[in-house]
Amino acid sequence: MPKASADYIWMDGELVPWADAKLHVATECVLRGENVFEGIRAYWNETSGQLHIFRHADHIARLRQGARIMRMTIPYTDAEIEDACLTLLRANRFRETVHFRPVVYFAEGELTQYLPDEIRTGMFILAIPMPSKSSLKTGVKSGVSTWRRNSDLSSPSRVKSGANYHNSRLAYIEARLN
């Protein structure tokens, strides 16, 4: 099981010690899951002694597309996001395969309805060691869930958003407990 932490998180333009990276409980990110993210893998190559990021630019483009659908303005350019990811990976000195996640979120609001330009948009990137799953070699059991994917007409399921992942969490729990 990978450790669920690293030395640093990149948060709003700065490297922050893992234990000091905090969001207020009144953020829309916490209260309503208003965020978009990408999950990206960087594979460790022992021979070259380097991490190799899988389709980094494509993931950043999809992050930006999801933010656009959610009417969030990412406060960084694609080049700045890519540089932030590299800075974070280097600062943590990983020598193993890593999963990292850039997250764009709405910050503190008025706890009522608001327009996107009336609320601050923040960003953080976290990275943790995550080796390949053993199921790649052993296979998996499968089943049909009673939970159905949310309609794209009610909540854009094509967007990687924290709020959208509750649906898949319910299906996962059902599969594990049955």
Where do the language-model regions lie?
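Helix-start/capping segments and mature chain N-termini
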Residues: 1-75, 80-87, 111-178
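Short, acidic/charged, Gly/Pro-enriched secondary-structure junctions
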Residues: 82-110
